[in-house]
Amino acid sequence: NESGRAVGEAARFFKVAPADIVVFHDEIDLAPGRFRMKTGGGAAGQNGIRSLIAHLGADFRRARLGIGHPGQPQLVMPHVLGDFHKAEYPWRDALLNACADALPFLMAGQDERYQGEVLRLAPAPKFSPRQAAQGDD
């Protein structure tokens, strides 16, 4: 994934500082439906994030949307590139809607308040919907 090339060029052209860029991405290190804001850090195996770091530096803001880890390393690629199971639609849709509804806080640079509002509007499921859906395939 080479998203960093395009984002880096646009940031330089429009004179946007990395700290003013927010990247929304899936995160296997967070349970399904969990959400966290973060600034800086490494790529954690994410090729798109690695590309962004190469072209912007690491100091951009990250909205991390948990999709959970499939449990076995060989299942990671199909997990992150695959479609959501129907059982995951409720938490996925609630999380995306909460991210949109809380945007005024993010746009004001209030990342902690944004995270709190997203979590209030879309609490993470108490179980792994993907694991529950495994029997539905």
Please describe what each predicted stretch is.
Residues 1-40, 49-63, 70-75, 90-136:
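Nucleotide and nucleotide-moiety/phosphate-recognizing core
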Residues 68-70, 84:
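Generic beta-structure capping elements
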Residues 85-89:
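Active-site oxyanion-binding pockets that recognize sulfate/phosphate
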Residues 45:
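Short, conserved glycine- and acidic-residue-centered signature motifs
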Residues 36-42, 80-84:
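Short glycine-enriched, charge-decorated loop/helix-capping segments at active-site entrances
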